[in-house]
Amino acid sequence: MHKKLAFFSGFVTLGMMLVLIMGGTVTKTDSGDGCGTDWPLCHGKLIPTNPSVETMIEYSHRVVSGIEGLLIIALAIWTFIAVKHRVDVKIFAFLAFIFMLIQSIIGAGAVIWQQSDAILALHFGISLVSFASLLILTILLFEGDREHQVVSRRLRSHLYGLSIYTMIVVYTGAYVRHLGATYACVGWPICEQEVWTFESYVQMGHRVMAGLLVLYTLYVLYLARKEMNRLIERGMMASLFFILLQVGTGAWIVLGGHATYVPLLHAFLITCYFGILSYLSYHAYRSTARQDGAQLKNMNG
């Protein structure tokens, strides 16, 4: 086991979580234009003078994101040098870097070219994939070459499906924020106003999809229990905990949670949920690949 590398990877993963939360703060406080249309400079300067609150929020997000990007590069290089025999570990280090790079490009584009709400909504989801890649990398480094229980094809397929569907729900949630549709509905869980706007339909659509996500999570947990797969079952129980809290904070936002920390908690919970789900999905893929490899070895033996 590469302990130092594993702990460093864990530190970088926490850094990515901080980047996600700070990005949510930028969106919540409408600070995306806090540095004007300059990037990477802020109002034409390396360090802004007499900054407003919005400028400080946007500038600090850029600084932390830049430091995190350098840490991810260092982690990827260290991983490629130290863990030459593990292709999967190197792949996740590479994915973390690539998605961090894409996220930075979209962030810069939002400042310079004023992207549409539909494009801006991709920003959080891409950052989420980078975080999940770092989390999986960290877990793999701590695990070493440990063997795990094989996951059935049905359970594996539903884990993949749940992961993909989660990304769609995450996108709709980000679109709600960037569209300014957070308070487009009166009441919860159903929009109770007589006149519905486009923003109301977007908000209600996100609620319906989030409700289905909870049901799908329950179903995958049921499958894991039925097949007595303890690792998947424990992981899905943790996922259910986070998604229920996620729905609760969503209702809190609509019903009066106007404080900045409430939507940030909302983003934190879905990040934890997706991180766990991503690892379980890869675990399912990995266990199947090892089973196929063992069968092929027996046939050739």
Curated annotation (Swiss-Prot):
Keywords: Cell membrane, Disulfide bond, Heme biosynthesis, Iron, Membrane, Metal-binding, Oxidoreductase, Transmembrane, Transmembrane helix
Keyword match Membrane: yes
Taxon lineage: Bacteria, Bacillati, Bacillota, Bacilli, Bacillales
Name of protein: Heme A synthase
One MF term in the entry's GO annotations: oxidoreductase activity, acting on NAD(P)H, heme protein as acceptor
Enzyme class, spelled out: oxidoreductase
Cofactor(s) this protein requires: heme b
Gene designation per UniProt: ctaA
Pfam families documented for this protein: COX15-CtaA (PF02628)
The organism's place on the tree of life at top rank: Bacteria
Entry comment, domain topic: The N-half (TM1-TM4) and C-half (TM5-TM8) domains are connected by an intracellular loop. Each domain is formed from four-helix bundles and they align in a pseudo twofold symmetry manner. The N-half domain is the substrate-heme O binding domain and the C-half domain is the cofactor heme B binding domain.
The organism of origin for this protein: Exiguobacterium sp. (strain ATCC BAA-1283 / AT1b)
